[in-house]
């Protein structure tokens, strides 16, 4: 059976797409706008949540992007140096790895995920 091989893009509305795109490039290092972002290999999770979840922070929020990082502590330090508020909660961490949360300048929640090291 043929199946999907990965996520080809993430598209969302923004009040000021150019400015928000630059924020994602400058703060998170994600190539956006006119370029293609070649990701490093790693797991991707697609997980529908119940309609009444509070996991996305805002009731009207229909989605939340989760970016994989290799060193969550270093990323948190970098973001805080830039004055970006970072939320962590030990209850979010699991056998899947460690998590933190930020918001982009338009209030969209962004989850940062350091996957757990796989045992050989």
Spans of model-derived segments:
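Mid-chain, well-packed structural core segment of small domains
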Residues: 58-83
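Secondary-structure boundary/capping motif
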Residues: 19-20, 64, 99
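A structure-centric signal for secondary-structure junctions around beta-strands
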Residues: 4-7, 43, 59-62, 96-97
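Short linear motifs in intrinsically disordered
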Residues: 27-30, 66-68, 89-92
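Conserved short beta-strand elements that form part of the metal-binding/catalytic scaffold
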Residues: 28-63, 102-105, 109-116
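Vicinal oxygen chelate
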Residues: 1-6, 12, 76-120
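Core segments of cupin and vicinal oxygen chelate
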Residues: 1-5, 11-47
């Amino acid at each position: 059976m043929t199946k999907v091989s990965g996520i080809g893009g993430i598209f969302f509305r923004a009040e000021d797409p150019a400015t928000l795109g630059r924020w994602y490039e400058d703060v998170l290092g994600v190539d956006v706008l006119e370029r293609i972002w070649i990701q490093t290999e790693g797991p991707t999770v697609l997980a529908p949540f119940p309609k009444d979840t509070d996991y996305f922070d805002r009731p009207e929020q229909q989605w939340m992007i989760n970016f994989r990082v290799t060193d969550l502590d270093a990323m948190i330090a970098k973001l805080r140096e830039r004055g970006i508020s970072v939320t962590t909660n030990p209850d979010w961490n699991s056998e899947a790895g460690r998590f933190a949360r930020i918001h982009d300048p338009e209030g969209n929640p962004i989850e940062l995920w350091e996957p757990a090291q796989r045992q050989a």
